[in-house]
Amino acid sequence: MAELSDSNGGFWKTRYSVILMCFAATFVCYIDRVNISVAIIPMAEEFQWDLETQGIILSSFYVGYLIMQVMGGFLADRFGGKIVLGLGVLIWSFFTVVTPWAAFSGMIGLLAARIGMGLGEAVTFPSVYSLITRWFPVHEKAKAVAFNASGIPIGTVFALVVTPIIVSELGWEWAFYLFGLVGVVWYAAWHLVVTNTPEEHPRIAAAEMRYIAANAPAAGTVEAPPMRQFLRNKALWAIIVAHFCNNWTLYVILSWLPKYVNDG
């Protein structure tokens, strides 16, 4: 399909605001995910947790993540990425804030909070990709995905730098209170700025609307190929294996590196 000019409506496009908010969600996702890797050091000292207990606590997050991630894609397609991601951020922010209280209540409460946080965070990327599909022309999708993904290292570095300062100055509980509050502030802006589709946005320029409609054919309703066709695709399995290996290394390091450095 021929590309139309997107020269009208000024430099800043509405879709840029959408991806900026998606980036912010990914940033919040990772500061909330990583902060416990630092906070668990003083927590383990206070509650007398051995390494096995710490491993169970850190891994329980991924139980919730595993349960909801695939379902998150279905929910985003069914109800829209705005609603699903917005609720996801509120859910994981709630469980982030209550983590200290859950820890003082006992191991069952803490594990429930971590699993609940995983359930909320699992919808992040399915929802973001659903929005990118609807908001960005085909030739801009890779840049939009890359910009959103930059929230992962930026959020991780921020959490690894700022969390020790918070723990040192205010106590480990405040790492959860303050980071959880960021998600609530994000939601207020998200509700005002983002819509599921360009057609729903009250402030989008007509030129941008035409440009997206002409260059984002995937935004329409298209019948998906049968699942067995995907499962027979060698390239898909290569991506799955590479993604698994990358994530295995990444999350082991994110979970244990602060403690390794502290104990070393």
Which sequence ranges carry the predicted segments?
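Extracytoplasmic gate region of multi-pass secondary transporters
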Residues: 36-40, 231-264
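Helix-loop-helix hairpin linking two adjacent transmembrane segments in secondary transporters
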Residues: 148, 152-201
